[in-house]
């Protein structure tokens, strides 16, 4: 499955400036997803991080990973954000290996590594030109509203 920005807007509860995914290039519901974030100089966070050396904040890279995790789960026909809420319970083993700067295309890969009842653990990777920029494990809880 693939999703364009209009599909993502319908799938996720986020909006500008916090919607960080531009497209999803591959998705197997409840298994894996690959998403793209086009990092541009016009991002509002670059105003202060850092004015003379713009670097995407690591916390926003992790947020982009979390949004890809949401797509992975919400693309399942039985889930949608109107009827379900996903709560992030933990972010573990986060590592930032390479700065992400304006002009980069951030490719985010998430894989479900453990699922039990209403919780999912994801292994997440963010790459620029196939070089690992960041990685983390995210634990999330899916609750019916």
Curated annotation (Swiss-Prot):
Catalytic activity: a (3R)-hydroxyacyl-[ACP] = a (2E)-enoyl-[ACP] + H2O
Active-site residues, as the UniProt record annotates them: 49
EC id: 4.2.1.59
Pfam families: FabA (PF07977)
Enzyme class at the top of the EC tree: lyase
Signal peptide: none
Any Gene Ontology biological process: lipid A biosynthetic process
PANTHER family per UniProt: 3-HYDROXYACYL-[ACYL-CARRIER-PROTEIN] DEHYDRATASE
Family recorded in the similarity comment: Belongs to the thioester dehydratase family. FabZ subfamily.
Function description: Involved in unsaturated fatty acids biosynthesis. Catalyzes the dehydration of short chain beta-hydroxyacyl-ACPs and long chain saturated and unsaturated beta-hydroxyacyl-ACPs.
Name of protein: 3-hydroxyacyl-[acyl-carrier-protein] dehydratase FabZ
Taxonomic path: Bacteria, Pseudomonadati, Pseudomonadota, Alphaproteobacteria, Rickettsiales
Gene transcribed to yield this protein: fabZ
